[in-house]
Regions:
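Short low-polarity hydrophobic stretches
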Residues: 19, 36-37, 103-105
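Well-ordered alpha/beta subsegment
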Residues: 84-123
Length: 123
C-alpha cells in the first residue's frame, strides 16, 4: 500500500529516525499495522497499533536470544512470543485457530532512549 494511505505519526517518524541512526532502513512502505525495519540480517517490526497509543513496541524474531537484550530498565520483555498476522519475514505456526499465523516477541520500550538501546543490542 502507498505511504499516503497509512501516514506515519510524529512518534513513528522519530522512531524511524532513531532506527536509521542505528543502521536500520524501512524495508517497505508502512502498512496499517507494522513498519518493517531491516539492518543486515536482522528484521524487526514496529507495532503501529501500539504506537498510535504512544506505546513503543517492537516485534523481534522468535529465535532472537533475549538474554542479549540490555538488562537496563526500560524494556518490557515477555515470557513467550505473541501471534500476529502481517510479519512476513517471521515464521508461522498454529496458535488457537486452524490457520498458522506469524509470531514474534513483542518488546516494549519505555522511551526513545530504550528503543535506541534495543536496536543497538540487535546489531
Amino acid at each position: 500500500m502507498a505511504a499516503h494511505e497509512h501516514p506515519l505519526t510524529d512518534l513513528e517518524q522519530r522512531l524511524l529516525a532513531i532506527a536509521n541512526e542505528h543502521g536500520f532502513i524501512l524495508l517497505r512502505e508502512p502498512v496499517q499495522y507494522y513498519c518493517e525495519l531491516k539492518r543486515d540480517h536482522v528484521i524487526v517490526y514496529l507495532d503501529r497499533q501500539r504506537s498510535a497509543r504512544n506505546v513503543i513496541a517492537v516485534f523481534l524474531h522468535p529465535e532472537t536470544d533475549l538474554s542479549r537484550l540490555p538488562a537496563e530498565a526500560g524494556l518490557g520483555i515477555p515470557d513467550a512470543p505473541k501471534h500476529s498476522d502481517g510479519m512476513r519475514h517471521f515464521p508461522k505456526k498454529v496458535n488457537k485457530g486452524k490457520r498458522p499465523s506469524t509470531y514474534g516477541y513483542p518488546i516494549t520500550c519505555a522511551d526513545l532512549t530504550s528503543f535506541g538501546r534495543l536496536l543497538a543490542s540487535l546489531t
